[in-house]
Amino acid sequence: MIRGLVFKFFFYIGTILICVIFIPALILPQKIVLIGGRILGYWIKFCLYFFLSVKIEVIGTENIPKDKNFFIASLHQSLFETFFLQTIFNFPVFILKKELLRIPIFGWHLKKIGSITIARDKISKDNYGFYDKIISVTKNTKRPVIIFPQATRTLPDNKIPFKKGVSKIYEKLNFTCVPVALNSGD
């Protein structure tokens, strides 16, 4: 219990510090802010190991396409994977709910790194250009796109069906899908 609280304290303080330190990067090239995201991924990995003795095992990195566009469909069980996946994939673009951009400082960084937003609860005109944005990002930058198909954090034992958007991305864009399973919610 105490170790968990110490972990949370240092993780959140470190995350806030990294975001604040990278505020000046918001006027610099995008890649600088992307590096900040990767640092956050390594920070959470360090905190998990140092404070909780959690070792992270990643299996199947040899299946990540090297020379073609792809997208990642990942389960979403905690805040962990949103940071950690940035240490595995080459500066991914996240598809995320629009509301996250309203978070001061953090939302500014999400916007700067080129996150693709979607209004989850309603069909809006903003969502119509969704697939065009994905095509543009992947073809122009060669960055993979990460989507959380259940559209919300889900406990490991909860089986929530995937949203239709994932299959539509696969059908419309003809990109390879790299599925990611995890157990970070335990």
What are these regions (language model features)?
Residues 51-59, 127-129, 186:
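Short gly/ser/thr-rich secondary-structure transition/capping motifs
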Residues 106-107, 144, 155-186:
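A cross-family acyltransferase "interaction/gating" segment
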